[in-house]
Amino acid sequence: MAITEIQTATAGSVANLVPVVKAHIASSRFPNGGLIGVHATPTKTEYFQVVAVGGTTATDYDIVVSQDRADFTIKCNAKITAGFVPLGDMSVIQLTPGRMVEYAQAFTKA
C-alpha cells in the first residue's frame, strides 16, 4: 500500500515513545524508517519515530536501548527470537564527550 501521509511521534524517553507509537498503530499509522535519538541537553535525550498511513503494517512496536554494546546485541537478538523485526538503522546517541553512547533500535512485529 502506498504511503499517503506521515507524522512524527516524539517523546523524551523510550518508555514514553513506545506507547505513543503503539497508539498510532491502533489508528492505522505504522512506524516507517529508523528510530532517531538526539542528545537534546546535557541530561535529556529526545526520541523520534516517523509513522505513516499506508506502507508496511505492524501489530506491535518496541525499542531496545543500552549503553553497553554487548548487552545491546543480546537484547536485540532476544527481540528477534521473540518474532520482532528490526526497523531501519540503529541510532547511536553520544551522551557525553568521548565514548559514552547509547545504542537504540526500533523493532516491529507484523
Where is each model-derived feature located?
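Terminus-proximal functional modules
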Residues: 1-110
